[in-house]
């Protein structure tokens, strides 16, 4: 019997990419596969993301893993390179880079490279995390055009800070600023990530960058991915390793944080924070056992968590438990825990077995 296993539905992945294409038909797709494919497995996701025109990663190591696995499509470093010594690696492996600061620009100007690097100039349109400020934009464009180490034409991108908050004007302001700055430019542009392409169609430029939605997880609080026409790619399961009777008034788990109000049965499931399931999950967080939702009862420990199966439960050792997936949206679990689906799927540890199915696997 397996312990915790993440089942990855590659047909759902392909469905989701097709859905992105339906919603942004005029845009090319840069599938974002950073953080080990959002916890789904970098190489498997890239291999089966058939609708992707390019891939976006955060770290050069991720780009090199993709190249080593046989990926030949364009790859972009979304944070750019970290040091001048990275530039020859980009050239050798045909990796594109974001440029967002003076230090990166100077490194390009001073480098001696065999061939130019494809550069995306990142503009700070209002998030104020990475990117050149609007007043720096023209100077950066001019210097990049003059730099022999930069392939032409330049490309341009920015990132939204509040695209998941539909009642804010911030996204409209960022879009208008970016479009104004890049008006008349020769190169391709990218503005929309998941929330942008779903909710702000005016941000669907030459490229869109689906991340979390590609994995069937919604970027929005008020709508699940299923409601948006997407399918969950990951289903996280484990098994009951014990079913115990607990009397009214007895407490369960470390710290005695849950006390039974009745005689009941407690199920012990083989998954815990050592597998990446959050210790912060409170009492009442739902788990699915034999097709019904049951609440977490007691503190999540390193290797186990406990649920209240109810006094009349017929569940047995070895029965399956679903932590999130087809029958329990990860967005719902995240809401109970006070986090976001992104964090849950990316924090699974190496103890969790990955099992891929669908799409000819």
Curated annotation (Swiss-Prot):
It catalyses: L-alanine = D-alanine; L-serine = D-serine. PROSITE patterns: ALANINE_RACEMASE. Substrate binds at residues 129, 302. Pathway: Amino-acid biosynthesis; D-alanine biosynthesis; D-alanine from L-alanine: step 1/1. The active site is at residues 34, 254. Keywords: Isomerase, Pyridoxal phosphate. SUPFAM superfamilies: Alanine racemase C-terminal domain-like, PLP-binding barrel. GO terms for biological process: D-alanine biosynthetic process. Its cofactor is pyridoxal 5'-phosphate. The modification N6-(pyridoxal phosphate)lysine is found at residue 34. Its EC number is 5.1.1.1. InterPro entries: Ala_racemase, Ala_racemase/Decarboxylase_C, Ala_racemase_C, Ala_racemase_N, Ala_racemase_pyridoxalP-BS, PLP-binding_barrel. GO terms for molecular function: alanine racemase activity; pyridoxal phosphate binding; serine racemase activity. GO terms for cellular component: cytosol. CDD domains: PLPDE_III_AR_proteobact. Belongs to the alanine racemase family. PANTHER family: ALANINE RACEMASE, ALANINE RACEMASE, BIOSYNTHETIC. Catalyzes the interconversion of L-alanine and D-alanine. Likely plays an important role in supplying D-alanine, which is an indispensable constituent in the biosynthesis of bacterial cell-wall peptidoglycan. To a lesser extent, is also able to racemize L-serine and D-serine. Does not act on other proteinogenic amino-acids. This is Alanine racemase. The lineage of its organism: Bacteria, Pseudomonadati, Pseudomonadota, Gammaproteobacteria, Vibrionales.
């Amino acid at each position: 019997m397996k312990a915790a296993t993440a089942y990855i539905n590659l047909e759902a992945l392909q469905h989701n990419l097709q859905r992105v294409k339906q919603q942004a038909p005029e845009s090319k797709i840069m599938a974002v596969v950073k953080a080990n494919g959002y916890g789904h497995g970098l190489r498997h996701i890239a291999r089966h993301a058939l609708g992707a025109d390019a891939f976006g990663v955060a770290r050069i190591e991720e780009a090199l893993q993709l190249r080593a696995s046989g990926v030949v499509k364009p790859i972009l470093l979304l944070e750019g390179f970290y040091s001048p010594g990275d530039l020859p690696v980009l050239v050798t492996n045909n990796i594109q880079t974001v440029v967002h600061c003076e230090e990166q620009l100077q490194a390009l100007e001073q480098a001696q490279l065999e061939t130019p690097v494809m550069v995306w100039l990142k503009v700070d349109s209002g998030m104020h995390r990475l990117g050149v400020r609007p007043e720096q934009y023209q100077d950066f464009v001019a210097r990049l055009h003059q730099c022999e180490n930069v392939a032409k034409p330049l490309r341009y991108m920015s990132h939204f800070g509040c695209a998941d908050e539909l009642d804010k004007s911030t996204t409209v302001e960022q879009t208008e600023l970016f479009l104004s700055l890049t008006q008349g430019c020769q190169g391709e542009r990218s503005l929309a990530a998941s929330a942008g392409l779903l909710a702000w169609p005016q941000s669907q430029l030459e490229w869109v960058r689906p991340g979390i939605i590609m994995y069937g997880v919604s970027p929005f609080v008020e709508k699940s991915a299923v409601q948006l026409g997407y399918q969950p790619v990951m289903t996280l399961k484990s098994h009951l390793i014990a079913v115990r009777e607990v009397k009214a008034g007895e407490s369960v788990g470390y710290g005695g944080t849950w006390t039974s109000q009745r005689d009941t049965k407690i199920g012990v499931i083989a998954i815990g924070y050592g597998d990446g399931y959050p210790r912060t999950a409170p009492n009442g967080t739902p788990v699915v056992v034999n097709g019904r939702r049951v609440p977490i009862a007691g503190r999540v420990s390193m290797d186990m968590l406990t649920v209240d199966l109810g006094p009349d439960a017929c569940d047995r050792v070895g029965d399956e438990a679903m932590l999130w997936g087809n029958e329990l949206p990860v967005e719902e679990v995240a809401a109970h825990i006070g986090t976001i689906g992104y964090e849950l799927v990316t924090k699974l540890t190496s103890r969790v077995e990955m099992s891929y199915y669908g799409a000819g696997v």
